[in-house]
From Swiss-Prot:
Catalyzes the rearrangement of 1-deoxy-D-xylulose 5-phosphate (DXP) to produce the thiazole phosphate moiety of thiamine. Sulfur is provided by the thiocarboxylate moiety of the carrier protein ThiS. In vitro, sulfur can be provided by H(2)S. Homotetramer. Forms heterodimers with either ThiH or ThiS. It is found in: Cytoplasm. This is Thiazole synthase. One of its GO terms (molecular function) is thiazole synthase activity. It comes from the Bacteria. GO terms for biological process: thiamine diphosphate biosynthetic process. Gene3D superfamilies: Aldolase class I. The active site is at K96 (schiff-base intermediate with dxp). Its EC number is 2.8.1.10. Pfam families: ThiG. 1-deoxy-D-xylulose 5-phosphate binds at G157, A183, G184, N205, T206. InterPro entries: Aldolase_TIM (IPR013785), Thiazole_synthase_ThiG (IPR033983), ThiG (IPR008867).
Amino acid sequence: MEGFNIGGKSLKSRLLVGTGKFASYDLMKQAIEGCGTQVVTMALRRVNLDHKEDNILEYIPKDTILLPNTSGARNAEEAIRIARLSRAMGCGDWVKIEVISDQKYLLPDNEETVKATEVLAKEGFIVLPYMNPDLMIAKRLESVGAAAVMPLGSPIGTNKGLQTKEMIRILIEEIKVPIIVDAGIGKPSQAAEAMEMGAEAVLVNTAIATAQNPVKMAKAFELAVRAGRLAFNGVTAPQAKVARASSPLTGFLHEGEA
């Protein structure tokens, strides 16, 4: 499968994996290694440099790109502060912007997300903003320096799939930076659907971490993402209004009847 580019970094795996909700760090590590992801996202509060056994970084493969998120930020100012702290702690320049002031549905605040993205992009961060799919917001994020745009498929942790499919389709058509579908993808088939639409990648956490067998589920998502991308490149066949037989319905059975 061909690669894609984020912030000057070439990636082969189109599956990004979140690290929350796993029963243990060991299980998380097995899932990450088993699916071959190159980018993992994590909350900064789980980085504990003073206690090695409690430090999530000890369980993430060293060749994996860290994508710290600004989970807990309620406005742009808090997101910016978390991103700067992450860099100071040695977690790199990549950051996933999450600005959520709504505590019921956990929907991102698009306006505050744009503000944070603009500031951090100017400071040299590779910014991947999580956002409610809206074309004008996506264009603004692109214009202020977002390295990719991460529209939600459905609310975080719901596993409801691509409820915003048509809005995401518009972003795929109109936005030049990579579109990475994030949040709500609950099944490998839903990940494949996102890839068939033309998304560059998907980010999955809850559906893997809370599965009965997270390691197998992570592998299933890897294969689904690969299949979806292959289908996109192959260009799926158009729908027909009426039935069309794949083999002739007449011919040799009636030869010689005339």
